[in-house]
């Protein structure tokens, strides 16, 4: 509950500064505070008068250091008078001073403050002012006395004693201190030395509390300052001061430039921003107590500057702090008013240059808004201070205006949040006068006639007018009324007394403007029927209704008003004809203001009918579009007694519009208004008529019509695809099933999404369980195509007996058809008898040229832990989600088993597209003022506004996307689980099994061996010969025994090696052992029977049977009973999870919900299309084009960004949740229910036919493991090579695009033009006197054009500045940076030769100027570095022995706005480029992790790492450059008169420019990686590798010889020839000499003998000998390598051949001999080599 009191504070300061500015003296201030302890008793008033006589005041003991200073000199128990603060008036006192009080000051205080010491504690209390105590005076420096320093603690204090005293003190009239009169001098008698003691204390630049938190500030300000208050650099808000009869341009004053370092402000800012509220309050309190001791008027300017910078750097002020600050300035104003003005003629209307910056108002306002909440105890002091500041504000304004000789005068002050006008009027000029205040708070005031002001002007012929316009609400916390627009305050005063103006005969006009950006929500209606009706619901009788009609063309119409009925030409309550005549502003022509007296029917619904005139109807051929706005407004004034806004005595005038409110009031105070747009009822019929204007802008309607046609065509296609998918949703009963078999197995086969994953081969499956195995079954369906890419095929397989718990599954195919390769994802087998299922994760190829090149594979089931692991869930679900939940993509990739149809998906996409369009067009409607495309832009260029609108649309559309995308899947009907009849197990006994023949037993043995070899592929490599092709039973049994033993041993070792796997695999291992046990038992029985019946082989059969018996006993040891097994995780799962009692959605309810979803989609689509068409009709052609581009961008973002992000996020979330809660997988449960429902409908007793002789049932033969086919390896290498080439080309292209997109072809010409402009005659500068003419005739005109300023001639005598210094560079050259700074010349802080706005100050970063009023020390930049001293105070004299070395360097950088036209594509290329860099960084990091230190020995690794590091450095420099640019431009916008240094930005840009060439060079060198695949070009790398040792040796010899000759030339000729003056220049010259480009004439002329010898020997040794040997060694290595080069079949040739075939270019075929040679050699060739 605190208003912005700080705003009043600064309004108050500004006028005070204007008044006191003429007396502001630049005299230096003292730097010591002295305290005089007077040990004679006086009353408070006498003590105060005595201190004033001594040029001081009663001391303010507020600093702990001061207390420590005087503590030892205070007698215990004695009382000392000290100074006190001026407290604000209370509410019970009169808030307006009488005339005598206004002149003489506030009333005298009744209680005064004294100081006393109790032990070591010093305390202050109040007592009657008439009592007589000791007192303490304080001043800067006393008039006379000796001074010496004495150490007291950590501070140095100054003692001062009077040498002699007088009985009386004579005070001159002009030195008399302010006061009501002379006080008795009873206290002024001769004072002994012991009765008066003076203590002096050095003044710090900050109060003690501040210094504790800003220790760095004190150290930063190294220059001595004579000001007692801290000086901080300027702020950045301009202040404008305008007088009557003077233009604003002539009177605008810039903030005063300060020469202090910028670090001073930055340290203080950091300290105050980090300071707590208590510290800030204490600082404000200390300042308030310090200000009360000021007497001179120049102190006011100093206090204002300190407060200005304190408030600018303080983030917030509390209420007590603002009370103290306002109280201090009230005191200063009273002191100002007590002193009569001097030099009246000098004041005039000229604003002094030292005026305090008025932009502090904005800082205090922000601080007030950010202040924290406090208790209500501060409210009353703040309210009183507001009243007092307003009164003193008027008094100061009146005092200022009285100094002007003209009878009428005015001055205007403007800040960021307030505008103030002070004017003096008389009896003849005040009536009917008007005043207008401009930005930021526009207010217009008009006074009534002389008759209404007669009584006032008779009493006061001269009146001072004070008008204030505020852009904020100062009473926001006192009254929560919604005030909109400017707030005006009008005060009249005369003779320093406020005049009460109320109950006038005529109203005073106050016009209050509102912000033009205020949203008014206009409604566009059509006048096609020459009539429209507006319905408004009035809810308040105090407000006035404003009806604004804005036609697109001039119309003559009549408005009729009716209450609760629609008026017409004959039946109405009120009417008005528009446009109006004789209006003040044009927007009043079509505005109707209805006051409360016009709305006499009270609250209710009013109808306004607009009817075109008859002549207008005849002339109106096409329907006209009008924009209608209805709003209510009311005028208020601030009732100061009740602290609230009131409307009594004020009414809304007829000149009110949507942008302003005219208030007519009969009194003067604060005025404000509110504004509210009234909701209005829109007639839909009138809105639909807008479509008659579709010919003006058919973009939106045409786009909607095109989308509708496209939707209809696509829906027809989607409907046909959905019907075709219905045929694929079925359970196929295998044709080779036995009709009498009773055990059913449901097999779900998932084909992967890999490229060419579908197969045309015949697939066979075999199931293996603990109780046996099934027959091989051919998986086929004559009615549909099976095993399509990403498809699901469901088969029903039947067996005679139960297979028990499944442990293996075998798949193979015959490799037939056009595309036999098959990628199988997973297989799920369900046992319908026991309601269990097993998951077999395959994820492999069954092909002869892909994967492991196998056609026959055996898979084992996975456990629960592996099935629900996060890795498996995410990898499997990500593909499913992208193909099924990716809304746009799933229209084409929708799974037939998914119930979310293509038609539904397409409808959802169309709804999202229409929502996208309406959101886009709403943005363009809101931003219609800024949504114009640049005419110079290319037709397909993308603007920033279009990109931002598309991003905003995508963000808003994201939740809508989530809802619409899940609308139909959430209401899918759940299938009911069918009831299957129980199956009677009919297991055949062993006795009933028919005996097998020997051939069948051998086949059984072979099948078992093949199964074991396929199940454990690592056993296949151990078999040296294929014994499974033999018919010898002994060998087969031996092989079977070894395979089983190996399996058991391998399983045991695996369990010991990986203990965590023991809980998963042994359960499957148990079932596998049971299966082997049954197989061995059956084979042993058959072999035993054959041994008894077959006489010629009985021994073999019996031996085999006994061997199988031993193997069976071995298996029994691995098979534990069920009750003895440890608890292990099983690999079988229930077909369906246990139901939780949740009732499924019935079909009827599901159909109803589906209808509701369709209605919702239809309504959303129609509404979006309707409003899109309406909004698009109001867009211009340029806006429609931008809107179309935004729609395209939004759709692309939705397709390529929003949908993928949604899919990845939800896949990650579901995978994470399902890995912990597997029951959440409801989609698979629903699909399983649907499969079971289909299974219940199909008959499994279909007569089947099985041809046992069909070769498809024979598994492919097992061959020894061989290497992958060469064709497969070559394809892989070719694919990798193609990817490397494309990525490398893309990388280089993006790098070139990102670099050259920011370049401008005209930059060279601009650079040359600037260089020629500034370099003219610059080389002729040899002495300091030459510099000033060049700066005057070339530098300044080039910088500022033709403006020459008041002082057109620039000479050394005009400026008191030192010579330029370069402290960073020890060289003696001076550098002039044209783009980086501006030259400034100063004389005691004032500019010369240029206006101050063009010469902001000393800001050159590389130059230092010594500017001082004192005798200066000059350090000229000559080679001797002499130090010269000038003692001349008024002139400039120096001695210069050396001369300048002139050097000019020009640096420039491109602004961000210059490349904004095509910046979108540049940004896209940069983003993709840095993504590739991140990818390369990841690859290099992986290689570094693998290779460790060997990574740095690879040349390609170093090259790639260098590119990555330089790219990231460039990214950092770009970010730094953008940050600096935005920072500099923000500073420029804040204060355009302030100097902005671009030095740092230029340096960063220069570093980036020099560095950007290296990645281009390295990326070009990296193209060698592409050339090395050609055998002809690879010979170069091999040559360098072979000759590397010799090359290094020769390079070392050349370097040694070059160093020796460079040193010799430098020592012999360095003093005489400039080319050899340093070692490096000598080395460069020697290299040029060897290349033949150096001039040796100077060497021959200086020393013919020695010079000739050195040059001749260097040429012979280095050129003719060493370099020739170096080249010869390389040529020899090249010859050897060329002879050993063989013709190789490189991949690059294959790639070129494929590319030629793709483009239709004939490729020459090789002969048979060349092909044979190539094939013979190609197998031993390594294609991938390291880059040399």
Curated annotation (Swiss-Prot):
Catalyses which reaction(s): Ca(2+)(in) = Ca(2+)(out); Na(+)(in) = Na(+)(out); K(+)(in) = K(+)(out); Mg(2+)(in) = Mg(2+)(out)
Activation and inhibition: The non-selective cation channel is gated following an off-response property by acid: gated open after the removal of acid stimulus, but not during acid application. Regulation of non-selective cation channel activity by external Ca(2+) is bimodal, first sensitizing and subsequently inactivating the current.
Protein's name in the database: Polycystin-1-like protein 3
Compartment(s): Cell membrane
Source species, domain of life: Eukaryota
Similarity annotation: Belongs to the polycystin family.
Residue ranges that the Swiss-Prot or TrEMBL entry lists as coiled coil: none
Extracellular side: 24-697, 927-939, 1176-1198, 1301-1461, 1520-1550, 1615-1647
Domain GAIN-B as annotated: residue spans: 523-685
Pfam families linked to this entry: GPS, Lectin_C, PKD_channel, PLAT
Region (Channel pore-region): 1613-1651
Keywords assigned by UniProt, alphabetized: Calcium, Calcium channel, Calcium transport, Cell membrane, Disulfide bond, Glycoprotein, Ion channel, Ion transport, Lectin, Membrane, Signal, Transmembrane, Transmembrane helix, Transport
Protein role: Pore-forming subunit of a heterotetrameric, non-selective cation channel that is permeable to Ca(2+). Also shows permeability towards NA(1+), K(+) and Mg(2+). Heterotetrameric complex channel is activated by external low pH and Ca(2+), but opens only when the extracellular pH rises again and after the removal of acid stimulus. May act as a sour taste receptor in gustatory cells; however, its contribution to sour taste perception is unclear in vivo and may be indirect.
Positions in the Cytoplasmic compartment: 719-905, 961-1154, 1220-1289, 1492-1500, 1573-1589, 1668-1732
GPS, as annotated region: 635-685
Site residues, Cleavage: 668-669
Gene3D superfamilies xref list: 1.10.287.70, 2.60.220.50, Mannose-Binding Protein A, subunit A (3.10.100.10), PLAT/LH2 domain (2.60.60.20)
Signal peptide (UniProt feature, chain positions): 1-23
Disulfide bonds: 51-137, 112-129, 635-663, 650-665
GO cellular component: cation channel complex; extracellular exosome; membrane; plasma membrane; receptor complex
Gene assigned in the entry: PKD1L3
Modification comment: Autoproteolytically processed at the GPS region of the GAIN-B domain; this cleavage modulates receptor activity.
